[in-house]
């Protein structure tokens, strides 16, 4: 199984790159994790936000591998405690399909992305900055992996 993070935004601060890359490198070779960045639509005073969301959504879905399980990151999604995320990761592995996790831009995800998702994951009821979400997702998935393999990273 391969994990794929598809996220809107291409110019992240150095701390985001450093944090995300740190966790990315920790994943084992049998569970590759990749990041695909989708350019954010140009937002301005007179921007058509609905159209921008639609375009971003089209690009995100086009980046998802055929047959991949799509999981959106969205506030109204399911909140998993760490042990539950580890169980979810195991179920995804047993399913045998690659998993694409979608992070939208400032206005969130398009309705098409939400409709295409098999699952929706909420990190928090708080609105989080999208760059931070990349690091949180990578760390959370690495921690879940560490639980499933009895790696000492996670401590109760």
Curated annotation (Swiss-Prot):
Compartment(s) where it occurs, according to its Swiss-Prot or TrEMBL record: Cytoplasm
Alphabetical UniProt keywords: Cytoplasm, Methyltransferase, rRNA processing, S-adenosyl-L-methionine, Transferase
InterPro entries linked: Alpha/beta_knot_MTases (IPR029028), RlmH-like (IPR003742), tRNA_m1G_MTases_N (IPR029026)
Its EC number(s): 2.1.1.177
EC class: transferase
One term under GO cellular component: cytoplasm
Binding site for S-adenosyl-L-methionine: 73, 104, 123-128
Subunit structure: Homodimer.
Record function comment: Specifically methylates the pseudouridine at position 1915 (m3Psi1915) in 23S rRNA.
Protein name per the record: Ribosomal RNA large subunit methyltransferase H
């Amino acid at each position: 199984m391969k994990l794929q993070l598809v996220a809107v935004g291409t110019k992240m601060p150095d701390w985001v790159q450093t944090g995300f890359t740190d966790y990315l490198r920790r994943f084992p070779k049998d569970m590759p994790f990749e990041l695909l960045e989708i350019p954010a639509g140009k937002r301005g005073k007179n921007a058509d936000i609905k159209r921008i969301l639609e375009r971003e959504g089209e690009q995100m879905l086009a980046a998802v591998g055929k047959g991949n399980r799509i999981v959106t990151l969205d506030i109204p999604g399911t909140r998993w405690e760490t042990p539950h995320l580890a169980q979810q990761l195991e179920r995804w592995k047993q399913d045998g399909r690659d998993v694409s996790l979608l992070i939208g831009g400032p206005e969130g995800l398009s309705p098409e992305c939400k409709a295409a998702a098999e699952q929706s994951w909420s990190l928090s009821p708080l609105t989080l900055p999208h760059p931070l979400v990349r690091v949180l997702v990578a760390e959370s998935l690495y921690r879940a992996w560490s639980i499933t393999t009895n790696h000492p990273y996670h401590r109760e």
